[in-house]
């Protein structure tokens, strides 16, 4: 089962709160994929609860992209309750000046031979701030559990900000956990090289950003990946002027 949603809103004079709750239950052998592209206006406070329960041999995937809103706080969760259950969170966040994208994931291993994967990429533009908050819990006495977490950040300006807050709790010795994080910048040399070949600065920045998130964008359905790339191009044009 795949469910897709797109979120957007016009700019109003007053602030707006969006507080949605999504709950998924994947029974034995079921597979659920939930795809979101969020592009709320900058005066929206986007505070969302997303959680899933995966039973034996079930799989839940959250594929999430946050571009809009002034403040986003969203941490999709999967409780791996059945043996050989699988959970995955794919997350893209883009924060421009005046935005704080506070996103992440939670994986709770509650059965043997469960597997979880978290891949998060964020882009900070201007004075934008992107934060990753992740939590991985493996219960006591479990065997054969595996988790992989990757969180990478790209800073596009001197005042851009990124934060990473991982929390990993392993209560036994029967699990494998690995965590990787990186922060990088778009080099002036690369921008200069592309501009010398007739590529405007905004287009050059868009190419760099799209290259950074390309592997995750491919996880989105075709119509959503095209829209996502276009939204990023618009953000880059607005930020560069």
Which stretches of residues belong to each language-model region?
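Conserved beta-strand/loop scaffold segments within soluble protein domains that form the structured core
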Residues: 1-199, 217-241
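Small/polar glycine-rich anion-binding or flexible loop at a beta-alpha turn
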Residues: 187, 206-215
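Conserved tryptophan-centered aromatic signature that marks the ligand-binding surface of SH3
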Residues: 203
